[in-house]
Amino acid sequence: MEEFLTVGLWGGEGGDRWSFVVNNGGIIGMEIVHANGIASITFKCGDEYGVLQHSRKFGGTGEGWKTDKISLNWPEEYLTSISGTVADLWQHIIIRSISFKTNKGTEYGPYGVVTGQPFSYSTEGGVIVGFHGRSGTLLDAIGAYVKIPQKKDNTLKMALPVPRGPGPWGGHGGMEWDDGVFPAIRELHLYVGDSVIHAIRVSYQSKDGEPLLSPKHGGEGGEPIDPIKLEVSKEFLIRIAGFYGPVEGSGSFKALRSITFYTNKAKYGPYGDEIGQAFTSSVAPGRVVGFHGRSGAYLDAIGVHMEYF
């Protein structure tokens, strides 16, 4: 089974969950219905034999709204970036605008109205091969699936999405993220300052033994600590623990205030200040094989995927 990164979701919590991913081939077209926001999106894909496949329409009809179509010259041209904005429309948080970019530098959009909270994701050598989201009468939320190239690259990405492990623990702000699961965790990179965890970035190991670096989950603040480096043949994570609570100067906004990592060999941390509500992952025999959580300006929440012995 091919490995790919799950990116997002961005948007509201209305509507029903949906998912569309290309198994063989690539995305060759999209149809977007939009006006004051995004009413719906439809995908078209093709393979090397010219067989075409259309997704269902994700969203409503958008009666009277404008329809735009995107055509890509796959396999020479493929999607590498998605961006947009999220805001309220008719008392519902939805995708208000959306844009796409390809490996050729061509930009499509923005479609809809550029207003509200921005979001964006751009691959570093990967290919967007599908999307997931929420929709009802409008496009409530959207995320993407990114395929990992077959060539070796020490900054590329993730694995197949899986059911959630324990957690996440923390606040409810920011955007949801999920790295998936991996054979091993190689390094942990933390950004800490002002008694709060600003961000985390994880270096995993692929099934081929190659390092795969996750996106940076969190904001640009904080100072980087020395990376936690694990000798994967001998050392593995078994548990995380920490504290979360309101961030000073941010009212009731909650984020991770402290985090500690436990391996079968050692304890790393605590990093940050042990203030607020304590949490810990399972102490049952097993190992951590991935992380998920929420992030924005800070690392709002974190959880783990476990492989139990």
Swiss-Prot record:
Listed transmembrane segments: none
Residues in Jacalin-type lectin domain copies: 4-148, 163-308
GO molecular function ontology, one term from the record: polysaccharide binding
Pfam families associated with the record: Jacalin
Entries under SMART domains matching the protein: Jacalin (SM00915)
Keywords: Acetylation, Chitin-binding, Hemagglutinin, Lectin, Mannose-binding, Mitogen, Repeat
Gene3D superfamilies (UniProt xref): Jacalin-like lectin domain (2.100.10.30)
Modified residues (N-acetylmethionine): M1
Any one GO biological process: positive regulation of mitotic nuclear division
Role, per record: D-mannose/D-glucose-binding lectin. Binds N-linked high-mannose-type glycans. Has a preference for smaller (Man(2)-Man(6)) high-mannose-type glycans to larger (Man(7)-Man(9)) ones. Recognizes both alpha1-6 extended and alpha1-3 extended monoantennary glycans. The addition of alpha1-2Man to the Man-alpha1-3Man-beta branch results in a significant loss of affinity, but beta1-2GlcNAc has some affinity. Has less affinity for biantennary glycans, and affinity is very weak for the biantennary complex-type N-glycans with bisecting GlcNAc. No affinity is observed for tri- and tetra-antennary glycans.
Sequence similarity: Belongs to the jacalin lectin family.
Protein name stated in the entry: Agglutinin
Species name: Castanea crenata
